[in-house]
């Protein structure tokens, strides 16, 4: 009897460890997916900031690929339902970004992708680093940044123009303010 209890205990322990390892591996894969998406986004942002349309087109292809492959995993049902619609919007906006024929169209689509990505990041905790949502009142456009300091990708002649918006969901953005 003691041997069979030990065997049952050992079997349960092994099963628990296997499930834990699979869960950890799944979390690592999900985090890697989120990292690829956000890194692709940041490459496009850099190209837009540098007014590098040709280089941006190459990075946009990678961003659109990451957006299309992005899966919503490990969420509560209500978050899943809400983010499914946001994810579909982001896919459509990424396709528009990919088909942009000039820098102005690229910037417009990039702002739309930003708003969807921020909503997803906020819910899924996509990065351990501080990420800030920022806003350009002149262009009425958003972007994400690792820095609190404003480096506006939309206004080449006014790089410091903008405002910091932090921790707000889509639709809760403050009223635009004029730059000084």
Predicted regions and their residues:
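Intrinsically disordered, low-complexity segments enriched in Ser/Pro/Gly/Ala and basic residues
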Residues: 3, 19-23
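Positively charged n-region of N-terminal signal peptides that target proteins for export
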Residues: 1-7
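Bacterial N-terminal signal peptides
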Residues: 9-20
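Intrinsically disordered, low-complexity terminal tails/loops enriched in metal-binding residues
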Residues: 22-180
């Amino acid at each position: 009897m003691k041997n069979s209890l030990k065997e049952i205990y050992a079997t349960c322990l092994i099963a628990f460890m296997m499930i834990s390892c699979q869960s950890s591996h799944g979390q690592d894969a999900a985090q890697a997916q989120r990292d690829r998406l956000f890194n692709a986004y940041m490459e496009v942002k850099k190209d837009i900031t540098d007014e590098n349309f040709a280089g941006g087109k190459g990075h946009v292809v990678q961003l659109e690929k990451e957006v299309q492959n992005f899966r919503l995993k490990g969420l509560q049902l209500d978050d899943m339902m809400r983010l499914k619609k946001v994810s579909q919007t982001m896919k459509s906006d990424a396709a528009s970004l990919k088909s942009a024929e000039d820098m102005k169209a690229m910037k417009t689509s990039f702002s739309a992708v930003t708003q969807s990505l921020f909503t997803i990041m906020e819910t899924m905790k996509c990065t351990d680093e501080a990420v800030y949502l920022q806003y350009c009142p002149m262009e009425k456009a958003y972007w994400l940044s690792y820095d609190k300091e404003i480096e506006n990708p939309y206004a080449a002649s006014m790089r410091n123009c903008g405002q910091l918006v932090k921790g707000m969901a889509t639709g809760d953005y403050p009223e635009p303010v004029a730059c000084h």
